[in-house]
């Protein structure tokens, strides 16, 4: 994930900033507790494809 993209990309649900989980290759929204997958280098920012998580 390119740093420049991570600076501007936001959660499609609440519009808060996302963090990157390098190990799981996911974009994380800590506000909504959603993890968005990255497939073939492309972030999939669809709520239906996100998984719920609890910290």
Swiss-Prot record:
Q: Which Gene3D superfamilies match?
A: 2.20.25.10
Family annotation (Pfam families): Trm112p
**Matching InterPro entries:** Trm112-like
Q: Name one GO cellular component term.
A: cytosol
Specify the domain of life of the species encoding this protein: Bacteria
Could you tell me which PANTHER family the record lists for this protein? PROTEIN PREY, MITOCHONDRIAL, ZGC:162634
State the similarity comment.
Belongs to the UPF0434 family.
Query: Mind telling me which HAMAP family this protein's record contains?
Result: UPF0434 (MF_01187)
Designated name of the protein: UPF0434 protein BPEN_388
